[in-house]
Amino acid sequence: RHGCCKGPKGCSSRECRPQHCC
């Protein structure tokens, strides 16, 4: 799921962008 910070790497995830940070 792109733009989600709930991934394994959290906000460090490449798919997570600052503006989409949970």
Curated annotation (Swiss-Prot):
Transmembrane segments: none annotated. InterPro entries: Conotoxin_mu-typ. Disulfide bonds join 4-16, 5-21, 11-22. One of its GO terms (molecular function) is sodium channel inhibitor activity. Its main location: secreted. Expressed by the venom duct. GO terms for cellular component: extracellular region. Belongs to the conotoxin M superfamily. Negative results: does not block Nav1.5/SCN5A, Nav1.7/SCN9A, and Nav1.8/SCN10A. The cysteine framework is III (CC-C-C-CC). This is Mu-conotoxin TIIIA. It comes from Conus tulipa (Fish-hunting cone snail).
